[in-house]
Amino acid sequence: MSVDVQRITDFIWYVNSIWMLPIQIFSAIYILQKHLGLGALAALVTTLMVMACNYPLTRLQRNYQSDIMNAKDDRMKATSEILKNMKILKLQAWDNQFLNKVKTLRKKEYDCLWKSLRLQDFTTFILWGAPSLISVVTFVTCMLMGVKLTAGAVLSALATFQMLQSPIFGLPDLLSALVQSKVSADRIASYLQQSETQKDAVEYCSNDHTEFSVEIENGAFSWEPESSRPTLDDIELKVKSGMKVAICGAVGSGKSSLPSSILGEIQKLKGTVRVSGKQAYVPQSPWILSGTIRDNILFGSIYESEKYERTVKACALIKDFELFSNGDLTEIGERGINMSGGQKQRIQIARAVYQNADIYLLDDPFSAVDAHTGRELFEDCLMGILKDKTVLYVTHQVEFLPAADLILVMQNGRVMQAGKFEELLKQNIGFEVLTQCDSEHNISTENKKKEAKLVQDEETEKGVIGKEVYLTYLTTVKGGLLVPFIILAQSCFQMLQIASNYWMAWTAPPTAESIPKLGMGRILLVYALLAAGSSLCVLARTILVAIGGLSTAETFFSRMLCSIFRAPMSYFDSTPTGRILNRASTDQSVLDLEMAVKLGWCAFSIIQIVGTIFVMSQVAWQVCVIFIPVAVACVFYQRYYTPTERELSRMSGVERAPILHHFAESLAGATTIRAFDQRDRFISSNLVLIDSHSRPWFHVASAMEWLSFRLNLLSHFVFAFSLVLLVTLPEGVINPSIAGLGVTYGLSLNVLQATVIWNICNAENKMISVERILQHSKIPSEAPLVIDDQRPLDNWPNVGSIVFRDLQVRYAEHFPAVLKNITCAFPGGKKIGVVGRTGSGKSTLIQALFRIVEPSHGTIVIDNVDITKIGLHDLRSRLGIIPQDNALFDGTIRLNLDPLAQYTDREIWEALDKCQLGDVIRAKDEKLDATVVENGENWSVGQRQLVCLGRVLLKKSNILVLDEATASVDSATDGVIQKIINQEFKDRTVVTIAHRIHTVIESDLVLVLSDGRIAEFDSPAKLLQREDSFFSKLIKEYSLRSNHFAGSNDLLS
């Protein structure tokens, strides 16, 4: 999306060279034939041989480029996954491990780059040496064939070879660009040819042709069509208009796959799916777009105030809007980073409701909201504003089942039971498991109220790129020691080239009858030696540039990578992933393959033009007179052009990141976009962003043409003046042969002048990538990972006591305090429940405990150790946590359980058996090496959460934190998790952000937070004795909701 497209775009600059090069070569051969006769055949044969050598080299280079792109893909995929889950890595103290993973992938990419550059060095050596080789072979052939090499013939030949130099010298870049663009085009073509969603998976009917809104007949569906076991099988379903259908079942039973089959997202193996009416979809994992809350709710629809207010009220968002300074116009960070899980869930429910669809597919819509909000959502939204709509909702919360017209109980991908709530209870064949102790209600989620702008605009430099940027780049490797050697090698090449041509012009006889000054054999031997020396200088120069450029790129990458990994979470909250990925892909690619070459070309072209001016001034010093005003004009044009081009290039670079960001967001929400039939709108938005990027880029190209035209005019003027001067000089003033040599060099002057300015501007353009990478190499860092003189004991924390003393936390100096004067103590080995309304500060307390945010005042002491005095790795690696985001990483089950490779297979299997995943993993052919795709999409949400449980079972920390860890799993799985935690962490400290009542009641102590302060802190029993306590009110609220189940449960006895 970034590098491949950019390479194809860059190739446009070289398109004309493809057809111009053969014309230039054959035109040169024709001119040679006129002056050297049959000797020109030698030039033709040698040229064809050089070109033939390029064919195998080009094929090999294409393979290397393909390897580079594959290695880059692996690195970028890992980088993207890490950036999305950086909070998990920091909480688990895995950041160093995953940093090393990216470094390993970069090492693989580096090896591929080095192979490619070595081959490119060899290709450059051949092609830059080609003009000299062709001239030597041609002159030797002429000598052997008896062709007289007069001064006129030699100068004509040298002029022809001089004309060939520029296109042949540019051939390595042309071939490199051709190969890179071909590889990129093939990769894009391969991507475009991949299979798409089945277009005939769902039959859409009008309401007049069927009485059912949703109908599935003999359906079988699979996420992996090649698997012998379908994900869903024998599905028979008929849903009439206006019905409310609840879907429940255990973890991995196929609950979420059923709505996907109705949407056509899962591969249909057999059967028929018919849908009548407009659909709206709410996924299990909230998908939130960057932008305002209102934009997310409207989702492209027209704003209607009355309809909007009804929607917002039905989705219980009024109070949330009051928490924000800008209400529903508050900006949402990337992936809703500054919103709680409950808020994100309600926003996407509001998005669905506002669409006024006929059919609503809600995948676990109540899991992330508190008990009070859940009741409001169900009554006001599902049974209120959507009362006449067809609704299919997945849920594991049994209190929402009795109101359903139909309940589907899923097991192993099949509908095992179907009917109304009372009917299923009477059947007494397993449904009652879902109703056991139905105390699984959410109490609250967390919100971080921030007044300032969350997502910061990209910082761009203004004006001239600072000298320190150039200096940093040039001196990064060995203090810049390679730079003078590179310039020396190019200078030697230029001097040897001039010397060889001067030698031929000076020694060649003026006429066929004249006697040469030296024997022709000796003349050609000296010429060949000088040409060989110049070719060796080219080889030395290309090797030094490759070594210096790639080493510098690697150093810059390493610094940027370490800087990003050590950045605090506030950086990731305010910086879109697309912006960081743009640095790690497009900008890093410039450093890898282009930056050193572009800077080198600047030096080379300047040295070439200095050499040309030197030769012309040796012929007639008067030529220098015209060079002075021309040089002034060139500098004027360059200074007039460069600032414009530089700012346009910066604008183009800045506009590229939103394209990547929008593409990534669209990819993540593709199912929702298709369900809402919003594909055209997102494609249009993407095209608008592409236009915004292309607009400044087009002006960059136009400005370049503007400059080239004026420089060419100046060059032709200088050349014309030189010719007139040489013709008008009196006879005998200068050697005619040397004058001819001056004219020969003057022929390339117009190209060289344009090349110098173009290379300077192009290098400055590419230097912007260096500037941006340097910005990301200087991100303020977190506290040190390890402080050697403050390291805790190996068995710390052995008691598990946690003491908060006057703790205050704010997310930035200009943000309001989120936690205010928190003072309390969690005794070691006790179970602590933390509850509170939205925005009370629960999750912030946990983040402060792990130092994801640093206290602005006060201390946190664990087992008599002030955690702000020790290293972050020492702190985080000693604490265990099951976070709300159950992230799995691309790889295997083994990698996800034990990324640090600390445990044996036996210990891993024990942990899997304890968390009820042992049999599931054993059923896989790969066992512990079973595949986990990106984000763990091939595992259910519940299974992902059990894997997270397996991690803490292996870690065996004396302090365990549960941050709404079971919000998205069914009652049975939640019971399993609670049972395991009670058994395995019996004498250890467990801090639970409570989302279900029974986890709080069974705690030893309950901490109630309100508006960032401690409202209550005592045992559940004592809090319940106080009827006015916040905790008592929560229990009463839950009891009122649960009373109507009592009668139903009696049917089971």
UniProtKB/Swiss-Prot annotation:
Catalyzed reactions per annotation: ATP + H2O + xenobioticSide 1 = ADP + phosphate + xenobioticSide 2
- Which locations, inside or outside the cell, does it occupy? Membrane
Q: Which CDD domains match?
A: ABC_6TM_ABCC_D1, ABC_6TM_ABCC_D2, ABCC_MRP_domain1, ABCC_MRP_domain2
- Where does the record place the ABC transporter domain? 214-437, 804-1036
EC numbers: 7.6.2.2
Q: What SMART domains would the database entry show?
A: AAA
Assigned keywords, A-Z: ATP-binding, Membrane, Nucleotide-binding, Repeat, Translocase, Transmembrane, Transmembrane helix, Transport
User: Which class of enzymes does this protein belong to?
Assistant: translocase
Entry's transmembrane regions: 11-31, 36-56, 125-145, 151-171, 481-503, 523-543, 595-615, 714-734, 738-758
For binding ATP 1, which residues are annotated in this chain's numbering? Answer: G249, A250, V251, G252, S253, G254, K255, S256
Residue sites binding ATP 2 per the record: G836, R837, T838, G839, S840, G841, K842, S843
The record's InterPro entries line, in alphabetical order, gives:
AAA+_ATPase, ABC1_TM_dom, ABC1_TM_sf, ABC_transporter-like_ATP-bd, ABC_transporter-like_CS, ABC_transporter_C-like, ABCC_6TM_D1, ABCC_6TM_D2
Q: Taking every annotated instance into account, which residue ranges of this chain make up the domain ABC transmembrane type-1?
A: 1-180, 483-765
Task of the protein: Pump for glutathione S-conjugates.
Q: What is this protein called?
A: Putative ABC transporter C family member 15
Q: Which organism is it from?
A: Arabidopsis thaliana (Mouse-ear cress)
